[in-house]
Structures are given as structure tokens and as C-alpha cells.
């Protein structure tokens, strides 16, 4: 049974992950997201998963905040990711490293593509960048 989505029960959200059923028609859901686009952003992870977060609050702004707090340049930051919700972080970091199992969209903008997590990808990237 399909349910109509409303924001009536949501108070002051910071972030949400929403899953839709396989083969479901998410167009109504996307329309609801578009209706709050002045305060919230959303990232379509895949056909059944959306990440919803406060406008201009994402992994990229988080990386910038932490780097500023630690008084280091984002040029000296290494970001590892595997999904399109990591794109903002890759754009903020000096070095964006896509895991071997990453989505194609992320691999296209990555500075380097390493092995998957299961194949010690982070270790191999550290070796590649002479960090260890």
C-alpha cells in the first residue's frame, strides 16, 4: 500500500536517510523534497535511498569546518569515499580518493581510485601517497 509523504510530523530535522521500496515510484517523494529546497538539500544515493540534510551542510562543509578548527589547509586533507554523497567532500579536500567499489560518478572526480575496503584500499592509498 502506498503512503503519501508529508513533513507534518518532522520537527527541526538535521539529517535523514530515507529508503523507498524497490520498484517504487518515488516521484511524489522527490516532489515533497523539492518543496522544501529552500532549507534542505537531498542527495539521491541510488534508486531506493535518499539522504536529506540541512541546506549547505554536507561532508564538504564538515571537512572545511574541521580543517579550520584544526588550523590546517583543506589542501592537506585526504578524503576517502564510495558514494555520491561524498562528492562535496571530494570537492573540499585537496585529495579525493575513491574506493574500488565506489560509484562511477565519484570515481570520475577522484584524484585517485584505490582498491575496495575489503582489499585494504585505504592502506594502498596511504602507500600510494607515501603517507606510510
Each predicted region: which residue ranges?
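Conserved acidic, metal-coordinating active-site core of Asp-based
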Residues: 1-80, 84-89
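Acidic, Mg2+-coordinating phosphoryl-transfer loop and its flanking beta/alpha structural elements
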Residues: 63, 73-110, 115-117
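Generic C-terminal helix-cap and adjacent flexible tail
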Residues: 127-132
Amino acid at each position: 500500500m502506498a503512503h503519501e509523504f508529508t513533513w507534518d510530523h518532522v520537527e527541526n530535522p538535521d539529517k535523514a536517510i530515507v529508503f523507498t521500496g524497490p520498484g517504487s515510484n518515488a516521484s511524489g517523494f522527490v516532489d515533497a523534497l523539492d518543496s522544501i529546497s529552500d532549507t534542505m538539500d537531498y542527495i539521491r544515493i541510488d534508486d531506493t535511498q535518499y539522504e536529506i540534510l540541512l541546506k549547505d551542510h554536507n561532508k564538504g562543509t564538515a571537512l572545511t569546518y574541521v580543517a579550520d578548527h584544526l588550523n590546517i589547509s583543506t589542501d592537506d586533507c585526504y578524503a576517502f569515499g564510495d558514494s555520491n554523497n561524498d562528492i562535496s567532500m571530494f570537492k573540499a579536500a585537496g585529495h579525493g580518493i575513491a574506493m574500488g567499489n565506489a560509484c562511477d560518478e565519484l570515481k570520475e572526480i577522484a584524484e585517485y581510485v584505490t582498491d575496495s575496503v575489503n582489499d585494504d584500499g585505504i592502506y594502498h592509498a596511504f602507500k600510494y601517497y607515501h603517507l606510510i
